[in-house]
Regions:
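Generic recognition of cysteine residues
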Residues: 21, 38, 99, 139-142
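Flexible, glycine/proline-enriched loop segments at strand-loop-helix junctions
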Residues: 129-141
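A generic local secondary-structure boundary/capping motif
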Residues: 22-25, 80-83, 144
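A broad detector of short, well-ordered amphipathic alpha-helices
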Residues: 10, 76-80, 145
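Conserved small/polar residues in nucleotide/adenosyl-binding loops
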Residues: 142-148
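Short, conserved "active-site rim" segments that organize catalytic pockets and cofactor/ligand binding
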Residues: 1-73
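Short HxH-centered metal-ligating active-site micro-motif
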Residues: 55-132
Length: 149
């Protein structure tokens, strides 16, 4: 039985052998916008179809929870790069329902890491980062649920 990696490499080899990517496309997006969205597996292909965008139209940045954490976090840096290197004129931020990030907390992920053998010493080094990143989502989720009642 083939491993997942072998399957992916076989698909890539066939893709390249059949020249399925023959059209040259500029690294500069034709529609001059960037899209920030979640890395959720349900959005693969769906987001492009839902928004009517195609290869070469936009810079697409995906991360867990469509998050923009920190004044100069990696997502902010990426967006700045799109503006000042790739001449992006607009940025669209698209979230989705039932986001896994909104349904978890720093306590949840730290518990899971602990149960997989990550030491308390290592967890202490990253605990604050997870609290800053994940716990505001939980607050927003509860606030949103309360507003719906």
């Amino acid at each position: 039985m083939a491993t997942l990696l072998q399957e992916i490499l076989t698909n890539n080899h066939e893709f390249l052998a059949n020249n399925k990517c023959t059209k040259e496309i500029s690294k500069y997006p034709q529609k001059k916008f960037a899209l920030l969205t979640c890395m959720d597996t349900r959005l693969v292909e769906l987001i492009s179809k839902a928004l009517g965008i195609h290869r070469g139209d936009a810079k697409i940045i995906q991360n867990a929870g469509t998050s923009l954490i920190g004044e100069m976090g990696e997502t902010v840096k990426s967006l700045l790069l799109t503006i000042y290197v790739f001449d992006i004129k607009e940025i669209f931020i698209v979230g989705h329902y039932d986001c896994g990030v909104a349904l978890t907390s720093s306590k949840d992920i730290l518990h899971n890491m602990r149960s997989r053998g990550v030491s308390e010493q290592q967890l202490k080094l990253i605990e604050k980062d997870f609290q800053v990143w994940l716990d505001p989502y939980t607050c927003l989720l509860y606030t949103s649920d309360a507003a719906d009642e």
